[in-house]
Every structure is written in C-alpha cells, then in structure tokens.
UniProtKB/Swiss-Prot annotation:
This is Transmembrane protein 41B. It comes from Mus musculus. The chain crosses the membrane at residues 52-72, 109-129, 147-169, 197-217, 225-245, 262-282. Its main location: endoplasmic reticulum. The gene is Tmem41b. Disruption phenotype: Causes early embryonic lethality. Conditional deletion in the liver leads to decreased number of circulating lipoproteins. The keyword Cell membrane does not apply.
C-alpha cells in the first residue's frame, strides 16, 4: 500500500515522492537516504530541466497576462483618470481609488466587473503576486457579505490550486534547489497529520506559521493531494477573509491594511485555528488509548 511505502521512507525521500521524484530516487545510486549527498543529488538531477521549466513558466504567464489584457479590453470605456486607477492595489489608497472606479460601473456592467475581479484575484494567487489582501477588502466594499465571502474563498481556492499545478509542472527544481530543508521539515508534519490533512491545511491557512506561497508551491512536491489542498484552502481562508471583507464595508475610513485587523479578530482567528485542529488531536488521543 502507498501509505506503508511512505512510512518506510526517510523525510527526504518523502519530499521527492512525486512520480518524477520516484523515478529519480530509483536512479540515485549509493547515496544514503537522508544524507547531505542525498539531498544534493536531486537538485543536480533537476538542474538540466530548470531552463525548460523557466520557458514553460514564462509561456504560461504570458498566456495568463494576455487573458488579463482581454478582460481589461472588455471593460467599459474609462476616462483617463479612471484608467490610471485600474491597477492592482499596492496600498490602501490604491484600493480606495480602484474601489471608486469599480463601484461606479458595478451596477451597469455587473458581469464585466465581476469577471475582472475574479480573473485578477486568481491571476495574483496563481503566480504568488502580492495584492490579493486588498482585493479581499475591496470585495466587502463592492458586494454583499455572503457573495463577497464565497467569491474570495473560491478565488483563493482556485488560484492556490493553479499555483499548486504550476509548481507540479515546473516548480520542482526551485523547491529542490532552494527550499529543500524547509520542505523536508514540512513533509514530516504532513506525514504526521496525514489522516487529518484537511484539518491541518485549514489550520495553516488560518495561522501565519507558513507563508501561503510556500504552502502552494511545496504541496505537490510532498504529496498533498490536490482535492484535499483545494478543500482545505477554500475553508481555511474563510476566517481571515471574514475579517478583511468586514473591514471593506468601511473602506473609505481605512488608511492601512493593518487597520483591518483588530485584537478581537486576532483572538477569533486563534480560536478557529484551534477548533480546526482539535478533531485530529482528539482522535489521536483516542487511538493511543485504545491501543
């Protein structure tokens, strides 16, 4: 069984247990698993494909950027000032200016605005580009709370899943070369929580222990199933998004993104994070008791 096979491997072997990684492990020779030489062999094996991976990544990014260009071209005619404000927000002033433009056209061009928001959010998430936090806040300004929350969770889940697939396709050389030690440590945690992986992913999305971009690009390398990854992300981003969307209802009163988070909201997020991991803790204790 696959589970038994993973249990017999060293943490480093678990890191490389993708289909491509398994083929490479079988041809690695006499290096001892878990040794420094063993850790270095994989980057060497993947080095030849780094250039190909980069070309594929650039091609995919170019296609995605072209789609974003088409979405922008399909937008209603804008004034010169409005065109200047139609950009990915980098601070709260940008978010306010963009919100002002989108709210002006939202009622008349509802579908175009919704598609533009949806596509932009997924684009940022897919390529790990900063700015999605401001789009989360902006959703609370533009849409009713239930729709805004569903929209942000769906965009986050899809965007992170696209990033996952992109990493599976072309990102492994980067993980093997630059993130090996961190990925090995996380692979150990994943194996420890394998029976409750959805709860663990939810916990990680709520808490700031691991950056989202790191979770996205290393998950396919350490055998986190895509279905589990999507569900855990969709549910896990809901509590932080709740805070951001709620803040978006008072967008014009905010001056920085930090003002969207209060001590009460941090406390609530910590409680929800603990609740998400409790089933795994209780089941583990019951299992040990009956054994």
């Amino acid at each position: 069984m696959a589970k038994g096979r993973v249990a017999d491997r060293s943490p480093t072997e678990m890191l490389h247990s993708t289909p491509a990684g398994d083929r490479a492990v079988r041809t690695q020779g006499s290096a001892a698993p878990g040794s420094k030489d063993h850790l270095n062999e994989k980057p060497c094996a993947e080095a030849g494909s780094a250039r190909t991976s980069l070309l594929i990544l650039v091609s995919i990014f170019s296609c995605a950027a072209f789609v974003m260009f088409l979405v922008y071209k399909n937008f209603p005619q804008l004034s010169e000032e409005e065109r200047v404000n139609m950009k990915v927000p980098r601070d709260m002033d940008d978010a306010k200016a963009l919100g002002k433009v989108l709210s002006k056209y939202k009622d008349t061009f509802y579908v175009q605005v919704l598609v533009a928001y949806f596509a932009t959010y997924i684009f940022l998430q897919t390529f790990a580009i900063p700015g999605s936090i401001f789009l989360s806040i902006l959703s609370g300004f533009l849409y009713p709370f239930p729709l805004a929350l569903f929209l942000v969770c769906l965009c986050s889940g899809l965007g992170a899943s696209f990033c996952y697939m992109l990493s599976y396709l072309v990102g492994r050389p980067v993980v093997y070369k630059y993130l090996t030690e961190k990925a090995v440590k996380w692979s150990q945690q994943v194996e420890r929580h394998r029976e409750h992986l959805i709860n663990y992913i939810i916990f990680l999305r709520i808490t700031p222990f691991l950056p989202n971009w790191f979770i996205n690009i290393t998950s396919p390398v350490i055998n986190v199933p895509l279905k589990v990854f999507f569900i855990g992300t969709f549910l896990g981003v809901a509590p932080p998004s709740f805070v951001a969307i709620k803040a978006g209802t008072t967008l014009h009163q905010l001056t920085t993104a930090g003002e969207a988070v209060s001590w009460s909201s941090v406390f609530i997020l910590m409680v929800l994070a603990l609740l998400s991991i409790l089933p795994a803790i209780f089941q583990k204790q019951l299992k040990q008791k009956f054994e």
